A protein has these predicted regions:
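SAM-dependent methyltransferase
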Residues: 139-209
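A short SAM/SAH-binding and catalytic strip from SAM-dependent methyltransferases
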Residues: 103-119
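C-terminal lobe and adjacent flexible extensions of AdoMet/dcAdoMet transferase-like proteins
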Residues: 205-243
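A short glycine-rich, Lys/Arg-flanked "PGG" loop and its adjoining helix->strand segment in the class I
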Residues: 122-134
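A short acidic, Gly/Pro-enriched loop at the edge of an enzyme's catalytic core
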Residues: 95-105
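Class I SAM-dependent methyltransferase SAM/SAH-binding core
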Residues: 47-93
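Conserved class I S-adenosyl-L-methionine
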Residues: 1-44
Length: 243
């Protein structure tokens, strides 16, 4: 079960747009002519989307949470950039969005793991390929699930700011899926639940390559952060760029 309303106020603090992220995407933009067309899946409150649009890039953000899409839409009213937000599931992307239109599609902050069905995950890779322009790039950022292979319960890296911290854990549930539990602890010690045994799919590097190849992707690059440091199975995070 999800309690997204408990995280909206703190979302930008827990998932800040960093200079490293900006540099990462600035390098990607060099491969395409302006305006670069971005599709951001699981855009949250839209902070990164507005940062991407500062140079005139065309940015579309998708979000399934009504609370987060409301926050993103409110941000749009105060900033004059070429950004649009839609409350839309990945299941419906190809029905409503332009095929072959986007230069870069991103799904960050482990949002892809909430597609907790192998068939629907494969569909995600096929659909993203359909929406990408020729030589377009798909960017994924998620927890490195090689950390979960041995333990029944795995603690994820803590996210924190001055006001709040998020504590997350993954628990095996006896199937191919796992349970994600997340709590927020505020500065005064109050505990707010965000995820309670929410089912997620432990997507690995090997499956990303397999699903990607099936969908027509041929080039895969893996890093352990947006700094583009070399990925290893011991990395906390997995960043993938594929074409």
């Amino acid at each position: 079960m999800e309690y997204i309303q408990n995280v909206v106020e703190y979302y930008d603090e827990l998932y800040p747009v960093t200079d490293t992220q900006k540099k990462f995407y600035a390098n990607i933009k060099k491969s395409y002519s302006m305006p670069v067309k971005f599709l951001q899946i699981g855009c949250g409150t839209g902070a990164l989307e507005h940062a991407l649009a500062q140079d005139g890039s065309d940015v579309t953000g998708l979000e399934v949470s009504k609370e987060l899409i409301a926050a993103a839409s409110l941000r749009k009213r105060t900033q004059l950039t070429a950004v649009r937000f839609f409350q839309l599931s990945t299941l419906d992307m190809t029905r409503f969005l332009g095929k072959g239109f986007y230069n870069v599609i991103s799904c960050l902050n482990s949002r892809i793991i909430f597609i907790h069905d192998r068939i629907l995950l494969k569909k995600f890779f096929f659909d993203s390929k359909v929406l990408l322009s020729k030589d377009g790039t798909l960017v994924l950022a998620l927890f490195n699930f090689h950390h979960t292979e041995q333990a029944a319960v795995t603690q994820l890296p803590e996210l924190s700011s001055i006001r709040v911290k998020m504590i997350s854990s993954l628990k095996k549930n006896g199937t191919e899926l796992m349970y994600l539990n997340q709590n927020i602890e505020t500065g005064n010690g109050k505990i707010l639940k965000v995820m309670d045994n929410e089912e997620v799919y432990p997507l690995t590097k090997e499956e990303i390559v397999a699903f990607g190849k099936d969908a027509g992707y041929t080039k895969f690059c893996f890093y352990n952060s947006f700094s583009m440091d070399e990925y290893t199975n011991n990395s906390d995070m997995l960043i993938c760029m594929m074409k």
